[in-house]
Amino acid sequence: VLNLAELDRGPEAAAQFRESLRAATHDVGFFYLTGHGVPADLEGRLLAAARAFFALPEASKLAIENTKSAQFRGYTRVGGERTQGEIDWREQIDVGPERPVITDPAAADFWRLEGPNLWPEDLPELQSVLAEWHELLSGIALRLLGAWAESLGAPADAFAPAFAPDPSTLIKVV
């Protein structure tokens, strides 16, 4: 368990956080982050919007099926994905940051994943709460990435060319 707020509690606490982060990522491979500042009301609104989305009629969800998105965004029905050949028994919606489609044929293939999301017409609050979630969590991720770089002996902005200022993220609501 790592407390991100330790970065704000002085040089010694920040150094200890970075060392704990390095150990967790190097020796364990995962960690649970606390002290991130995500408001409980935002978590609640996100969970409520997710429940409301999955309670929509099938036709409403299929109207934004990810097969209609060149960026693989939108709804995936139960059994619509497989892992190692086995059906994944879940439904989900995938969203990313709202950005223009990259049309440059010389751009790397991964840039084709940038673009618009598909949103359900009958649940507009899903878009606003996920945009708020994305904005907040992207900032937390960039802060954590800077601490991780420092934990490895690099400058805090070592990963910035790859991830900042606008990280390419994917939110999967399951």
Can you annotate each of these PLM segments?
Residues V1-V174:
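Peripheral, non-catalytic segments flanking oxidoreductase cores
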